Amino acid sequence: MNKDNALQGSSTRPSQGHVGYVHSIETFGSVDGPGIRYIIFLQGCPMRCLFCHNPDTWKQNKVKSMTADELLDQAERYRTYWGEKGGITISGGEALLQIDFLIELFEKAHARQINTCLDTSAQPFTRIGLWFTKFERLMKVTDTVLLDIKHIRDEEHRKLTKFTNHNILDCARYLSEIQKPVWIRHVLIPGITDNDEYLHELAAFLNTLHNIERIDILPYHTLGTYKYDELHLDYPLKGVEPPTQERIDNANKIMESALK
């Protein structure tokens, strides 16, 4: 993974439209949307997922701020690698916390004929008021959504993330209603999301949607646990091991039914 050394931050830049608060940039991503992607990770996330491997993205600090044009100018340096399907992906943290910036960024990206992809857990989603109007506008310039569903059962979702999943599943339904291309992402965690009854329940929900292009089962891992030590935080899933390849294959097989 290449990190963009040109990432610049400024808290004193004169106002030039919205600015995004950026955690990091990956210049050559191959799994975060169609083709080769330039991935911008935004800072800030309300969820506290027990398995989170990027706790350093939680606080929405403003250390690294960049304008849409600055990010797009940097991204276009890598355009020759994108091919026909590649482009930019905005991830987090939770990117929708910065929805005004996202709208400006994606509208300017489309003006430059850059493919756009939003990677989100949809925690801020609501169909009420001004926020929904903004989301509708954002979807007009979003080519693909990577929707991360943490848990299909609300009670367990609250234990896992501290938030309900009602609005998240409603976001999935809305994206189906407008036929927005969606890739589903789901972390396979032994003892939490790795049992057949649960996986069939998830597949049954996904089967009610009509816009799913791909389902990615992401095996739980412990690669980010060192960050908890650096931040003087306790890691909630200490002792939980990654799933076996057999269980990963089993989950993928069950999810195949949701794509038929």
Tell what function each PLM region has:
Residues V63-D73:
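Short cysteine/histidine-rich metal-coordination sites, predominantly Zn2+-binding motifs
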Residues V22, I39, Q43-P46, T57-K59, ...:
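N-terminal/domain-start segments enriched in small and hydrophobic, helix-friendly residues
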Residues S65, K162-N165, P242-Q245:
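Short, conserved loop/turn and helix-capping segments at secondary-structure boundaries
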Residues E76-T80, E84-G87, G92, L96-L218, ...:
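Conserved AdoMet/S-adenosylmethionine-binding subsite of the radical SAM
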Residues M1-F41, M47-K62, R77-E84:
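N-terminal [4Fe-4S]-dependent radical SAM core
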Residues M1-V31, L188-K260:
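Auxiliary Fe-S-binding modules of radical SAM enzymes
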Residues D56-Q60, R158-T164, H232-V240:
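Short glycine-enriched, charge-decorated loop/helix-capping segments at active-site entrances
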